[in-house]
Amino acid sequence: MVDQRPRAGSRSFTAPSLIGTNGHFASVGDAAHDPKAYEHGVQVIDEEKEFNPNLSKYLSLEDVTNAGFNYHLISVFGSQSTGKSTLLNHLFGTQFSVMSDKERRQTTKGIWMSKNKTKHEDPNARMADNILVMDVEGTDGRERGEDQDFERKSALFALATSEVLIVNIWEHQVGLYQGANMGLLKTVFEVNLQLFLKDKNTTHRSLLFFVIRDFMGNTPLKNLETTLLEDLSRIWASLSKPQGLERSTIHDYFDFAFYGLPHKGYKPDEFAAEAKKLGSRFREGRRDRKEQLMGASIENGVFLPEYHRRIPADGFAHYANGIWDQIVNNKDLDLPTQQELLAQFRCDEISREVIAAFDEAIAPFEEKQAAGVRAGELVILGGLGAAMRGARVKAVKNFETEASRYHKGVYQRKRAELEGKIDTRLKALFQGQLNAAHKSGVKDFSDAVSNAVKAGQKKGASYDFAEIVKQETKAALERYEKEARASLVEGTSWSNYKQELKLYQKDLAEVSGQLRRDEMRRLATRVERWVRSRLSDSVSLEFNSLGSGRGGSGAPETGEKPSESKIWDRIWNLFVETVLDAERRFTDRATSFDASVDEVDVGLWRLRRKSWGVLRLKVEEEMMEGNLLLKLRENFEDKFRYDEAGVPRIWRPTDDIEGIYTRARESTLTLIPLLSKFHLAENNAPPPLDRWVGHTPSSATAADEEDLTPIGGVDEEDGKSLEEEVTILNDAKRQDLTVRFKKAADGVYVEAKRSAIGGITQVPLYFYGLLLALGWNEIWAVLRNPAYFFLLFVCAIGAYVTYQLNLWGPILKMADAASRQALEELKKKLREFLEASDTGRQAMAMSSGEEYEMSSLNRGGKRVEDEDENDDI
């Protein structure tokens, strides 16, 4: 399309009036949320100096956000209404609004941005990717008048953000001060020095690209270039420079490029061709150090690496906002600080995004582990290691990809913080996993050993406990290491389980030691049961054969009958032999448990003490009052009722019953002091119990001693002597036992006397006939009544059994003794009653001092004692 040069004062808007400010571009407001509002660009800063918060939205829609450093920023300067927007539209295919031919007034307000839209088919003429073009409000406009505040602020903003500053001037303005924008360029130089003062470590180079419009060619471009450079150098020399920069030149901070464009209205075709040629220069370029030192102008690609501000595209909007905030508030612009602030902002933002993705992968594992802890369950998380490794690598890689383009110091610090946060959570999961594997492994190990032992016991075969422990320990360690290796996260200092493995091995050793001790306790219990069974039979036989005076029951079938005086010797020898056999069994079995010498010593020491306790209890059981009295009576009856050949005696009145009774009774009475103390006959002293038990092993613990019964003469702290330990019956019990035995012996004696007398007297025969005649009705009633008959039958059976056991005498004797005891108690209660009442006390006071004992009389009025004496006779 061919345009004629518009006449002065006749330009106006060419865009539709319905599209907001400047005709085409989205400004701040609700329309910014509509993607179609960004089709032609975005107003970065409006005429009221407000920054557009939707700049990042525009960059995202233009696919610039993910470009990293692969983008370029160009700003255009120039006087108002000099065709800056028209130039940009032809160079980059943008649609900045331009003035119409009908009126002349300000069109660009504030600062606008648009992405390059030009497409070149020729690869050699192809522009760089992602070129962002900023159209800056023109200077020297009548709308702002003498207010140059925005002019200075916009220049500072453009210089802080742009790589290339296009200065749009007309050829006839070269050599002028205001017309050639020298005032604006002086502002640019001043703000550049201001930036340098804040960052002396970095030289912010920029390219000033002078596009000379309406270039006729009469004056060579080289001459125009020389004129402009002289004017610029003079302006630079006039600036007040900071200390140390007095001799600096303009070429230390700026590069220059020049290009002339024909008149757009008079030579439209040439203008279009030259504009296309000029556009091809906006690509990446290179130049050597020599050209830079010579200050040669840029002839080829204008985007040199040193021009780039090194702000990643995804952080540019925030960076630009921070820059403008500093500028608009008249604060000293500190680009390094702004870059660091941007880096902190973007790194924090990227870190949050990365952590959010990290949470999706790790949070479910954390919740499962926490739920297991709350429930008290051991939860081993499957696939945890792979999830942790993948989540960490992905998080760090994503952060590195997005954040490494920013300030290195901030990036490295934020990366360390991110890794610290991630590693803190992963370490907690890792430790929790190892802890669960630890506890679960110990429990499984204990259960496996116990089950293997039980299986061996059920089979009844001998099992090797040490081999079981060895195999299960190996399996437990393999399971733990497998789980630990699967949970490792490479590249982290905390991902190491050597210390945890040592603790696990230590706990397995402790558990195996406890299991071995428990097994040895069970072994000791089994051996103790065996000892108890053997001693129970052996000791019972000794006491059953105690003092047998006949060759029948109670006497050995072969050999000589045992001596009563050596009963304790025989019991001690049996006890020592039994325990010695038990010790051999215990030692052999404990060796298969891989028990240490100390553990075996403690086990044998406990076995001896426990065995003595078993013997002591068995002896006390046999020596219980009822059992001992019965054994003494049997001993007495064996000697009294049977002769030396073991033949039962048939008592006759002519037999020396009194002599036999006295000898048998005295012989039996000698057993009471013999049985009262566990003394050996050879030295009439207690057995060497203290020497036999031995001293307490040094390796014995309090737990080994807590269930042991103190032994007198062995345990000094018990305060009990060996003599007291072997005393079975004290003096009181001996006396009581003697009295009771004599009464029992007397009953046997009386029965024998009655038996001798009863053998002579006979019941008359007529008595049986009389009994039958008088009791016929009663006999018939009993026979006809089943209840009476059954009762009679039971009584007959009971009487027969009593007769066969020869218990009628003892029963009658016990009944007589019980009746006498009851009578004595009745007298005692009656006396207490009388003493308690007033009448009784008076009666007792009136009675004489003499007392008379009440005697038992028979039906004939004779005393019972007299009748007994007559019977003896």
Curated annotation (Swiss-Prot):
Keywords: Coiled coil, Endoplasmic reticulum, GTP-binding, Hydrolase, Membrane, Nucleotide-binding, Transmembrane, Transmembrane helix
Major location category of this protein: endoplasmic reticulum
Listed Acidic residues bias regions: 703-716
Pfam family, one: RHD3_GTPase
One example of a Gene Ontology biological process annotation: endoplasmic reticulum membrane fusion
Cytoplasmic side stretches: 1-762, 808-873
Binding residue positions for GTP: 78-85
Domain GB1/RHD3-type G per the UniProt entry, residue ranges: 68-320
Transmembrane segments: 763-783, 787-807
InterPro entries: G_GB1_RHD3_dom, P-loop_NTPase, RHD3/Sey1, Sey1/RHD3-like_3HB
Region (Disordered): 691-716, 839-873
EC number in record: 3.6.5.-
Positions of disulphide bridges: none
Topological category with respect to the lipid bilayer: Multi-pass membrane protein
CC terms in the record's Gene Ontology section: endoplasmic reticulum membrane
Compartments where found: Endoplasmic reticulum membrane
Function: Cooperates with the reticulon proteins and tubule-shaping DP1 family proteins to generate and maintain the structure of the tubular endoplasmic reticulum network. Has GTPase activity, which is required for its function in ER organization.
HAMAP family to which the protein is assigned, alphabetical: Sey1 (MF_03109)
Record protein name field: Protein sey1
